[in-house]
Design a protein with these regions (language model features):
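Active-site loop/oxyanion-hole signature of alpha/beta-hydrolase fold enzymes
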Residues: 32, 53-56, 65-105, 267
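Catalytic active-site module of serine/aspartate enzymes centered on a nucleophile-bearing elbow/loop
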Residues: 245-279
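Conserved alpha/beta-hydrolase catalytic His-Asp/Glu region
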Residues: 139-141, 154-213
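Flexible "cap/lid" loop of the alpha/beta hydrolase fold
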Residues: 115-120, 125-156
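Serine-hydrolase catalytic-loop signature spanning alpha/beta hydrolases and amidase-signature enzymes
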Residues: 43-53, 64
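Conserved serine/cysteine hydrolase catalytic core
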Residues: 195-240
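Gly/Ala-rich beta-loop-alpha elbow adjacent to hydrolase catalytic centers
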Residues: 106-110, 114
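Active-site glycine-rich loops that stabilize anionic/oxyanionic intermediates
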Residues: 35, 43-46, 108
Length: 279
């Protein structure tokens, strides 16, 4: 029988949210559920809320963790210090007493972070799920954000955020009113810091694009057939070059796969998780 103290600990463990001071910054996080840690990493300009349909669903079987990256959502803005998102994530997990290998689910920028994390901390990574992913070192052919950064510097962050929301990368998502509204709420809330300042992912070069073959964690690569060509190319290359990777293409789905098609996304993620080896 559990003691009263243990009961309290388990209750907190099941549902917790707040901020942690780690790596010289303040990071917002939420935890729900028990079991193997399942960590959700959001995309550029978005925040932890993009994972609503996954966070609550998978918390029935996993200890789900989601966060706002430095400069996004409810986390603190960056200063002048050097930092990386993957180091921030590792520090946050340690501060939450999560010391066993984790399953990382990252969307776009979040996928880039998941790859970097897995390369730098392989013993701390059980598996990675790359959704419409970016990978550091890939040179985009069509998806270029220089114009967006220039608009932010010339016409202001709010103007640049409106232009970003109107970008073709969100075209399929904008056709779905609830998804479109949820995306705009996050983009509107976004600080815009990275539009006018140094981007953290450039502060450490892990040569991820050249080192995909060195990834050892089980990997799911998932993208929508309506995504932009660059992201489809990245996903195809990742699925081909990462040893044993599984590839899933969701039909009639664009860049924001988990929000545009949550039922199919959750099914594919659940199938992948169920097939992972049990420690």
């Amino acid at each position: 029988m559990l003691t009263k103290k243990q009961d309290l600990r388990v209750t907190v463990h099941k549902n917790e949210k707040g901020c942690k001071l780690v790596s010289g910054t303040r990071l917002y996080y939420e935890i729900k559920g028990e079991g193997q840690p399942l960590v959700f990493i959001h995309d550029f300009s978005l925040d932890h809320r993009m994972w609503d349909d996954q966070f609550y669903y998978f918390s029935r079987w996993y200890r789900c963790v989601r966060l706002d990256l430095r400069g996004f959502g409810q986390s603190a803005l960056p200063g002048q210090e050097n930092y990386t998102y993957h180091d921030d994530l590792k520090a946050l997990l340690i501060s939450l007493d999560i010391t066993q290998p984790v399953i990382l689910v990252g969307h776009s920028l979040g996928g880039l972070i998941a790859v970097n994390f897995a390369l730098k901390f392989p013993r701390f990574t059980q598996a990675i799920v790359l959704c419409s992913t970016q990978i550091e070192g890939y040179v985009f052919k069509d998806f270029k954000l220089d114009a967006l950064f220039n608009k932010a510097k010339r016409k202001g962050i709010e103007y640049a955020k409106r232009k970003w929301f109107a970008h073709n990368v969100f075209a399929p998502a904008r056709k779905n009113k609830p998804v479109s509204e949820a995306l705009w709420q996050m983009i509107h809330f976004y600080s815009g810091w990275h539009l006018v300042d140094k981007h953290a992912s450039l502060s450490e070069d892990l040569s991820a694009w050249e080192n995909l073959e060195n990834l050892t964690a089980p990997t799911l690569v998932l993208y929508g057939n309506l995504d932009l060509a660059d992201f489809r190319e990245i996903s195809e290359a990742a699925a081909f070059r990462i040893r044993g990777a599984k590839k899933v293409i969701l039909p009639d789905t664009g860049h924001v796969v988990n929000m545009e098609n949550p039922s199919a996304f959750n099914k594919e993620l659940q199938n992948f998780l169920a097939a992972l080896p049990v420690d």
